[in-house]
A protein has these predicted regions:
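Gly/Ala-rich phosphate-binding loop of Rossmann-like dinucleotide-binding domains
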Residues: 20, 24, 162
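Glycine-rich FAD pyrophosphate-binding loop
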Residues: 24-48
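Conserved Rossmann-like nucleotide-cofactor binding loop
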Residues: 15, 40, 206
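Short loop/edge segments at beta-strand edges and connector loops
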Residues: 36, 89, 123-124, 172-174
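Helical element adjacent to the flavin cofactor pocket in flavoenzyme catalytic cores
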Residues: 141-198, 202-209
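Dinucleotide-binding Rossmann-like beta1-alpha1 core, especially the glycine-rich loop
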Residues: 51-126
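Central helical "cap/lid" subdomain
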Residues: 192-233
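Beta1/beta-strand and adjacent pyrophosphate-binding region of the FAD-binding site
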Residues: 2-15, 33
Length: 233
């Protein structure tokens, strides 16, 4: 039997869950299915990151990344506060470790201002008041007071709770293995068949592989990079 949904979202990371959340807010009657290949949420990039909520100073102005980062950081901070989720509003300092890097401070400052972020160029004395152990070789640093640190797993679990309360269906341990775009249908590894009105690919680093199942973007291949973080006690 083919089950019918208005919207199918592939991937239950922060992107997939957030897309589902925004859609169900607009249309509470929308029949939404989220398909996740892992046994739970947060097993990849969405749950394995530093948790830094960037304020929007890194990306060139007039790019979608700049727009979404600046606006999204405010929305995410508000979401954490509204749901009593952990958020550390500690700010961030960026400082050059070499003389030749000083121009980057001016570049990031200009981008931050143009992107609508709150940024300030500070002296070594001001830096020492924020972080006594930090030193800048150029006597200048960039201060981003609105940068925060959040708990990615707490956010993912809260959005999942919100979605399930709103009637959104989430299937785990399931992945799409074949698709018929002309008929708007997909089949999964569990031999389930689903029909969709719209389908959104939110599988992040696997999005190129998934797209090829739908005969889309065959000329593209993602090149993923792995980040490693140290935990300080």
């Amino acid at each position: 039997m083919v089950r019918d949904y208005d919207l199918i979202i592939l991937g239950a990371g922060i992107t997939g869950l957030s897309v589902a959340r925004e859609r169900i807010k607009i249309d509470p009657d929308c029949r939404i299915l989220v398909i996740e290949k892992e046994r739970r949420i947060g097993m990849h990039g969405s749950g394995r990151n530093s948790g830094v909520l960037h304020s929007g100073i890194y990306y060139p102005t007039d790019t979608l990344k700049a727009k979404f980062c600046a606006e999204g950081s405010v929305l995410m901070a508000n979401y954490c506060k509204e749901n009593n989720l952990p958020i550390l509003e500690c700010g961030k300092v960026i400082l050059p470790t070499k003389i030749e890097d000083e121009s980057q401070i001016d570049l990031l400052y200009e981008r931050g201002i143009n992107n609508g972020a709150t940024v300030k160029i500070i002296s070594q004395e001001e830096l020492s008041e924020i972080e006594p152990e930090a030193k800048t070789v150029t006597k200048r640093a960039l201060y981003s007071p609105n940068t925060s640190v959040v708990n990615p797993h707490a956010i993912l679990n809260q959005i999942k709770f919100d979605l399930e309360k709103s009637g959104v269906t989430i299937f785990f341990n399931e992945r799409v293995i074949s698709a018929n775009p002309d008929a708007n249908t997909v089949e999964t590894n569990k031999k389930n068949s689903f029909k969709y009105g719209h389908l959104i690919n939110c599988t992040r680093q696997y999005s190129d592989v998934v797209s090829k199942i739908f005969n889309v973007s065959k000329q593209y291949t993602l090149l993923p990079f792995k980040g490693i973080y140290y935990g300080l006690s």
